[in-house]
A protein has these predicted regions:
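Membrane-proximal helix-turn-helix segments that form the acceptor-binding/catalytic region
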Residues: 1-14, 27
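Acidic anion/phosphate-binding donor-loop and adjacent secondary structure
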Residues: 25, 36-56, 91
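Conserved donor-binding/catalytic core segment of Leloir-type glycosyltransferases
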Residues: 50-68, 74-80
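Short alpha-helical segment that forms part of, or immediately flanks, the ligand-binding pocket
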Residues: 108, 131-136, 150
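Acidic donor-binding loop of glycosyltransferase active sites
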Residues: 112-126, 139
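Short hydrophobic beta-strand element within catalytic cores of glycosyltransferases
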Residues: 131, 140-144
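Conserved acidic donor-binding segment of nucleotide-sugar-dependent glycosyltransferases
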Residues: 155-167, 176-180
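A charged, aromatic-enriched C-terminal amphipathic alpha-helix characteristic of glycosyltransferases
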Residues: 164, 180-212
Length: 215
């Protein structure tokens, strides 16, 4: 399938990240047939509160799997894990910090309860949707570089953990606390950054412009 996408000269390819675009371009795809339309979140669907119910807690939201590395961080106090469980890692689903899998509507209402979100995955296709959901809900983020492709990492509520610090639990915990302390004071600014950059309110316009620009 990938080979067909690269060699295709008839159909347009919509890339959900600039990472995808650069990969296709590098492998020889016709750049005239590549369009970038990033993934995003409908911010109006996400409940937002300026004062979170759990300001001293971090949410780790995502399928429990090796790539997302939740098993490394289960001993950090102040982190709660949500996502579909798979028995592919040593993650212990019987621990109190694992809240199971949320229904979509519940997620829309309760992401905003937390002080911040973390995602230290070892590979992502651009910035994951869950990070954009966190931002429009007012949460700061602590991420790996692989989950930060579309983020402004100079912002005080965006913390990137270097690869060589992934297994330094004390360091990760320190950065989570630092990020939470900053993020709970900037909830409105964080949400506005999420809306300005990752809301479908903006991205639909990009999609329409891409469609109208097709030759």
């Amino acid at each position: 399938m990938y080979k067909w996408l690269i060699e295709n000269d008839k159909y347009y390819n919509f890339c959900i990240s600039y990472k995808d675009y650069e990969t296709y371009k590098r492998d020889g795809a016709n750049v005239d047939k590549l369009l970038v339309c990033p993934n995003g979140a409908q911010h109006r669907d996400y409940h937002f509160t300026e004062k979170p119910l759990k300001p001293s807690w971090t949410l780790y939201l995502g399928r429990i799997e090796p790539r997302k590395r939740q098993y490394l961080y289960q001993d950090i106090y102040g982190v709660e894990f949500v996502g579909k469980y798979t028995d592919t890692t040593s993650f212990d689903r019987n621990r109190d910090c694992y809240l199971g899998q949320w229904e979509h509507e519940y997620k829309l209402q309760h992401v905003t309860d937390y002080g911040n979100m973390m995602l230290l995955s070892d590979g992502e296709n651009g910035t994951p949707l869950v990070i954009k959901e966190a931002l429009v809900a007012g949460l700061g983020v602590v991420v790996s570089k692989y989950a930060a492709h579309d983020l402004d990492t100079s912002l005080p509520f965006v913390t990137v953990i270097p690869d060589d610090k992934w297994e330094d639990i004390e360091y990760v915990q320190m950065k989570l606390i630092e990020n939470r302390k900053i993020s709970v004071t900037m909830r409105k600014e964080i949400r506005q950054y999420g809306i300005d950059n990752f809301s479908w309110q903006k991205l639909v316009k990009t999609y329409v412009e891409n469609i109208e620009g097709m030759k």
